[in-house]
Regions:
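Mature, well-folded catalytic/scaffold domains that follow N-terminal targeting or propeptide regions
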Residues: 2-332
Length: 332
């Protein structure tokens, strides 16, 4: 009689395990990929290549989100992530962050979000924290609990994600005026996300994005342009002509737009996904290579005092330092 040996269960294996939602709840919470198609959303008609890019991004986001409802292990997430292209990996992770936070609203389960943050928060800090914000848009009663789980430095990006969600899914209502009661930097971060949303609803057209921002309150425009800059660089599609057109159309807010570009560039370098497409535009705008810009952005982040990180002002201070760096470059 052959001896039977049981597989060894290690602490690492146990930590890797996740519990899928019941099938009936999965069915209720799952999102149809068609929801991000332009014809369904009613977005402005765009060039075919732009439309295909933005729809592909939305579908990658939903693949990440939907997987979290049924996933059984982080190994399964890693396998799915490996199937995504360099362009789409970050958006898959962003969707997964939304899904993780949403799954945690179901009672009597071991929280998924803290483990998701630990797994992907270092490589994709901006995408993970912004993705969580989309959940807050849907489950405002969970806002306090979710924010408490986030990195205190990047926590503001949850409001960015909330602004993006509202602009993307409720553009007419969001364009009509603020759809929140946020104060202080939370309101600014919200508008940075709304600016990202404007890039999508404008069909990746710098001109249409500029026209949209021009209809909004003047005090909101710096942050809206910052969001456009981030989306232009991270999502695209955009070449050097679009980068320089955005600088021109942003006018007095060009430094804000460039700040968004710098953050997107640093994020792409960090997750090793920067494509040839935006390289020339980044260099034309900033006057340095993408690698040098990403290094500078990281140096500025590390220069923020620990006291500012602890009291929640670090993220705003970081963005301000990036903006000043662009202003100095432009005047040199």
């Amino acid at each position: 009689m052959k001896n039977r040996t049981n597989p060894i269960t290690t602490n690492e294996n146990i930590a890797d395990q996740l519990k899928p939602l019941p099938a009936i709840i999965q069915k209720f919470l799952a999102l149809d990929p068609k929801r991000v198609e332009f014809r369904v959303r009613g977005f402005d008609l765009a060039e075919k290549s732009h439309e295909e890019r933005l729809e592909a991004i939305g579908k990658a986001f939903l693949r990440g989100y939907n997987l979290m409802l049924a996933v059984r292990s982080f190994a399964e997430i890693d396998q799915a992530l490996a199937q995504e292209s360099d362009l789409l990996r970050g958006f898959f992770i962003e969707g997964g962050a939304m899904g993780s936070a949403l799954v945690d609203s179901v009672p009597f389960r071991k929280p998924m979000l803290p483990r998701y943050l630990a797994r992907f928060g270092t490589q994709f800090p901006i995408l993970v924290h912004a993705g969580v914000g989309l959940t807050i848009s849907k489950l405002s009663w969970r806002e306090k609990g979710i924010l408490a789980e986030l990195d205190p430095f990047y926590r503001w990006l949850a409001y960015d994600g909330r602004g993006y969600h509202n602009m993307y899914f409720e553009p007419e209502r969001t364009l009509a005026g603020p759809t929140h009661k946020l104060r202080g930097y939370a309101a600014r971060a919200y508008d940075q996300g709304a600016g990202r949303g404007i890039w999508f609803i404008s069909g990746a057209s710098v001109e249409k994005a500029a026209d949209t921002i021009a209809t909004m309150a003047s005090e909101r425009r710096p942050d809206l342009w910052a969001g456009v800059g981030l989306a232009l660089c991270y999502a695209g599609p955009a070449d050097s002509r679009e980068f320089m057109a955005a600088k021109k159309l942003a006018g007095d807010h060009a430094a804000d737009m460039a700040t968004g570009v710098a953050l997107a560039c640093a994020a792409r370098i960090k997750d090793q996904s920067l494509s040839p497409e935006p390289r020339e535009g980044i260099t034309a705008l900033w006057g340095v290579t993408p690698e040098a810009l990403a290094e500078r952005v990281e140096e500025l982040r590390q220069s923020i005092p620990l006291s500012a990180v602890a009291d929640g002002t670090g993220y705003a201070a970081w963005r301000k330092e990036i903006l000043h760096a662009f202003t100095q470059n432009s005047s040199a």
